[in-house]
Curated annotation (Swiss-Prot):
It is found in: Cell membrane. Coiled coil: none annotated. HAMAP family: ATP_synth_epsil_bac (MF_00530). GO terms for cellular component: plasma membrane; proton-transporting ATP synthase complex. The gene is atpC. InterPro entries: ATP_synth_F1_dsu/esu (IPR001469), ATP_synth_F1_dsu/esu_N (IPR020546), ATPsynth_dsu/esu_N (IPR036771). It is a peripheral membrane protein. Keywords: ATP synthesis, Cell membrane, CF(1), Hydrogen ion transport, Ion transport, Membrane, Transport. CDD domains: F1-ATPase_delta. Belongs to the ATPase epsilon chain family. This is ATP synthase epsilon chain.
Length: 136
């Protein structure tokens, strides 16, 4: 059996992913990195991008959209604290664009300041998803 690393991803939206993987490819503020088993410890800021995980050495890479966050690499563990993540095959760009248009329309018609802030936050999240999606 191949030597594997535990990947843990956590977001403020209570999204969690925990699985054993062979490699994780990430885009940090310093450039792209690939984390393999027994990688030296490191901590870095990650940017909005499409990351890739490989479950086994010869397995195909699986694309995963990650938004801003921090990665901590330890001997047998990669921990990612990200604003948002989703596997690329689960993302429906048409639905995101439709939702974005609806949110912008709702914002233009909203008078309550608290609801405006919530709408702006959702708009920013969806715009970030679209930008990161183009990174693939």
């Amino acid at each position: 059996m191949a030597n594997l690393t535990k990947l843990k991803i956590v977001t403020p939206y209570a999204q969690n992913l925990e699985k054993d993987v062979y490699s994780v490819e990430l885009k940090t503020s310093e450039g792209r990195i690939a984390v393999l088993p027994d990688h030296n410890p490191l901590m870095s800021i990650i940017e909005n991008h499409v990351a890739y995980i490989r479950e086994l050495p010869n397995a195909p890479r699986k694309p995963l959209l990650l938004l801003d966050g921090i990665v901590y690499v330890e001997e047998h563990q990669v921990r990612v604290f990200s604003d948002y993540f989703k596997f690329l095959d689960e993302i429906k760009i048409d639905e995101i664009n439709s939702l974005l248009n609806k949110l912008k329309n709702d914002l233009a018609n909203e008078e309550d300041d608290k609801k405006k802030l919530q709408l702006k936050s959702k708009i920013k999240l969806n715009e970030s998803i679209l930008i990161a999606y183009k990174d693939r």
